[in-house]
């Protein structure tokens, strides 16, 4: 058996998330079916992160094991040929040691959340960014974001369906930047709780529009209470950017 590592890019709009679902299409299902068509064998895809319905990826790392003489280049070509009906692309394929694991070997994950801050309707970025018509103060959002950086109990910022045993996470980076009408929120950590990034962005948006004071973000954090969450940002503005591994 050979272990192949993939880098996946996908538009999450038509999928019910990355992981296989009983009642709807998933990225995992599409890739596994493409692999079956390419290799004439069943495989199981393992990925560095889990994305919800409508969440996108620029560089999701995944792996599967297969018995084949195909080179990574030819395998990538076959997968992409069978993935054409879907908004999924394999942008890299390589052979990894048999003990390497896309999820368990990962030591860092990064996301970006895109907000388009304008009144005019979105066209190209529809379903690929969150449109906020009210003027946002990105500098206030940046100051509030720094109150969340560090090791904290993020109970307020995780969904009620979160299966993580421990709500304590170390947030390494949360940066807010503006480029014209677009505001991007960058988040980096070893791992995240379910809905954590979207929950943090939602509260930063409230700060940006003046509904919340900057200090209220910290107050919500310290409350350790999901009921104190101000707003959960919609999924379509969120992108899994990259997974980091030991060198």
From Swiss-Prot:
Disulfide-bond pairs as recorded: none
Keyword set, alphabetical order: Isomerase, tRNA processing
EC number of the protein: 5.4.99.12
GO molecular function: RNA binding; tRNA pseudouridine(38-40) synthase activity
Catalytic activity: uridine(38/39/40) in tRNA = pseudouridine(38/39/40) in tRNA
Enzyme superclass (EC): isomerase
Residues the record lists as binding substrate: 111
InterPro entries referenced in this protein's UniProt entry, alphabetically: PsdUridine_synth_cat_dom_sf, PsdUridine_synth_TruA, PsdUridine_synth_TruA_a/b_dom, PsdUridine_synth_TruA_C, TruA/RsuA/RluB/E/F_N
Keyword Lipid biosynthesis part of the UniProt annotation: no
Biological process annotations from GO: tRNA pseudouridine synthesis
Pfam family, one: PseudoU_synth_1
Domain of life: Bacteria
Catalytic site positions: 52
Protein family membership: Belongs to the tRNA pseudouridine synthase TruA family.
Function: Formation of pseudouridine at positions 38, 39 and 40 in the anticodon stem and loop of transfer RNAs.
Subunit-level organization: Homodimer.
PANTHER family, per the entry: PSEUDOURIDYLATE SYNTHASE, TRNA PSEUDOURIDINE SYNTHASE-LIKE 1
Protein name stated in the entry: tRNA pseudouridine synthase A
Organism field: Erythrobacter litoralis (strain HTCC2594)
Gene: truA
């Amino acid at each position: 058996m050979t272990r192949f590592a993939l880098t996946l890019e996908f538009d999450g709009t038509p999928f019910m998330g990355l992981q296989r679902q009983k009642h709807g299409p998933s990225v995992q299902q599409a890739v596994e079916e493409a692999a079956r068509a390419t290799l004439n064998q069943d495989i199981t895809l393992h990925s560095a992160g889990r994305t919800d319905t409508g969440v996108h990826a620029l560089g999701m790392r995944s792996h599967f094991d297969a018995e084949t003489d195909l080179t990574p280049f030819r395998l990538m070509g076959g997968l992409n040929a069978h993935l054409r009906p879907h908004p999924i692309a394999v942008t890299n394929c390589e052979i990894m040691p048999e003990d390497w694991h896309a999820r368990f070997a990962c030591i860092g994950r990064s996301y970006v959340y895109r907000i388009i801050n304008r009144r005019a309707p979105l066209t190209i970025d529809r379903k690929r960014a969150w449109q906020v018509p009210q003027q946002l103060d990105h500098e206030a959002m940046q100051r509030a974001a720094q109150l969340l950086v560090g090791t904290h109990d993020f109970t307020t910022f995780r969904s009620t369906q979160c299966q993580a045993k421990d709500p304590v996470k170390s947030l390494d980076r949360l940066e807010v930047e503006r480029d014209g009408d677009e505001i991007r929120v960058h988040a980096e950590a070893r791992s995240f709780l379910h809905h954590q990034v979207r929950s943090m962005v939602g509260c930063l948006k409230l700060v940006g529009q003046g509904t919340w004071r900057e200090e209220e973000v910290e107050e919500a954090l310290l409350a350790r209470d999901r009921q104190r969450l101000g707003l959960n940002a919609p999924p379509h503005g969120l992108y899994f950017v990259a997974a980091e591994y030991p060198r």
